[in-house]
């Protein structure tokens, strides 16, 4: 019975909620955005808005570019030329795609120059490099994590450590992956990435943008000062988070008797927005671009608006080896790691961070 009971239990999920103000010296909003590296979807919702301003629309269209490179040898990411051209000049993120974190070998390059490898046991042993067991591989360690600091490595390319890693990637266990890459930089031509990897199959991409107007949207009433809500006066943060997910899924919020797909209804109390603008950006989006978008949404209330709040939601790649900073990320049954800002018209904000079963508590 105990085993059956465990099988019936839903996997553990965590939702952390906090509130602050963008003007506070100790506000964490910038640090949190900057350390959530691998983002594949960015969505924002603006109640009582039928048309985006030109400035906001232009910003949405400038969320790229990013690149895909097929069958890129891993040793290309540790060369002196690559580190000097990209890692040291700006902020570079890279992530393997078409790989599953719980089944395949996966690799991520973080903007701080850390190269993270999540490898199955056989591959790990064949590389001959030192790492540590994955936190989520069970009692028998079947997956291992290797972390390589490229900035430190580049200080001495004649070191024994560099020669060993280079030998491992080039000769002992050559590994090739399909990569997504995105690079935030200043003062360098955009074509640098294309020309550098010209001998491989490289393509430039722009994120896909979907704009829609939601009519007669039931919206929860919120009080910026109260995450817990107030009976009959305001909804709490968890109720709002559930509601927002339903809106993104285009679920019916009325709980009508004939609806067999969704029995969800908007929490009470609520108001009806005549129209709301929903924008979704999908691709490989850098934290720097997200931070600019967040700042622009804060300025949305510089002039009086009917909307009491707007939201910005960011979802990470389910198969990234890390979630926030260098914290290991696993898939289990969902692989979700995401955060949401509720931006109020007085510059207060709620920050909601959610992760699945194979993750540490969000920062």
UniProtKB/Swiss-Prot annotation:
The keyword Nucleus applies. Component of nuclear RNase P and RNase MRP ribonucleoproteins. RNase P consists of a catalytic RNA moiety and about 10 protein subunits; POP1, POP4, POP5, POP7, RPP14, RPP21, RPP25, RPP30, RPP38 and RPP40. Within the RNase P complex, POP1, POP7 and RPP25 form the 'finger' subcomplex, POP5, RPP14, RPP40 and homodimeric RPP30 form the 'palm' subcomplex, and RPP21, POP4 and RPP38 form the 'wrist' subcomplex. All subunits of the RNase P complex interact with the catalytic RNA. Several subunits of RNase P are also part of the RNase MRP complex. Keywords: Nucleus, rRNA processing, tRNA processing. GO terms for cellular component: multimeric ribonuclease P complex; nucleolus; ribonuclease MRP complex. The lineage of its organism: Eukaryota, Metazoa, Chordata, Craniata, Vertebrata. The keyword rRNA processing applies. InterPro entries: RNase_P_Rpp40. Disulfide bonds: none annotated. Component of ribonuclease P, a ribonucleoprotein complex that generates mature tRNA molecules by cleaving their 5'-ends. Also a component of the MRP ribonuclease complex, which cleaves pre-rRNA sequences. This is Ribonuclease P protein subunit p40. GO terms for molecular function: ribonuclease P activity; ribonuclease P RNA binding. Transmembrane segments: none annotated. It is found in: Nucleus, Nucleolus. One of its GO terms (biological process) is tRNA 5'-leader removal.
């Amino acid at each position: 019975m105990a085993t059956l009971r465990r099988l019936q239990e839903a996997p553990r999920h965590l939702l952390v909620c906090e509130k602050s103000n963008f003007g506070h010296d100790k506000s964490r909003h910038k640090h949190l955005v900057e350390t959530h590296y691998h983002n594949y979807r960015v969505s924002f919702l603006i109640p009582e808005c039928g048309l985006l301003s030109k400035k906001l629309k232009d910003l949405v269209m400038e969320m790229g570019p990013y690149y895909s490179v097929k069958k890129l040898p891993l040793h290309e990411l540790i060369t002196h030329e690559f580190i000097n051209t990209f890692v040291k000049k700006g902020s570079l993120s890279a992530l393997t795609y078409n790989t599953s974190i719980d089944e395949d070998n996966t690799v991520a390059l973080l903007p701080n120059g850390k190269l993270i490898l999540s490898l199955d046991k056989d591959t790990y042993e064949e590389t001959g490099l030192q790492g540590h067991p994955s936190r989520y591989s069970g009692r028998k360690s079947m997956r291992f994590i290797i972390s390589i600091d490229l900035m430190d490595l580049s200080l001495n390319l004649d070191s024994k450590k560099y020669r060993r890693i280079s030998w491992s990637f080039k000769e002992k266990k050559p590994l090739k992956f399909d990569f997504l890459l995105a690079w935030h930089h200043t003062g360098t031509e955009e074509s640098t990435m294309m020309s550098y990897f010209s001998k491989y199959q490289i393509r430039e991409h722009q994120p896909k943008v979907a704009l829609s107007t939601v009519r007669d949207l039931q919206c929860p009433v919120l009080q910026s000062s109260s995450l817990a809500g107030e009976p009959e006066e305001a909804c709490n943060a968890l109720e709002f988070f559930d509601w927002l997910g339903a809106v993104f899924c285009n679920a019916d919020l009325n709980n009508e008797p004939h609806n067999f797909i969704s029995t969800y209804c908007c929490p009470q109390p609520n108001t009806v927005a005549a129209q709301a603008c929903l924008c979704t950006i999908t691709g490989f989006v850098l934290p720097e671009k997200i931070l600019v978008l967040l700042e622009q949404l804060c300025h949305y209330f510089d002039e009086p608006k009917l909307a009491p709040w707007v939201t910005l939601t960011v979802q990470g790649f389910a198969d990234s080896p890390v979630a926030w900073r260098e914290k290991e990320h696993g898939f289990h049954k969902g692989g979700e790691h995401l955060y949401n800002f509720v931006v109020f018209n007085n510059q207060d904000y709620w920050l909601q961070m959610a992760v699945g079963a194979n993750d540490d508590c969000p920062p």
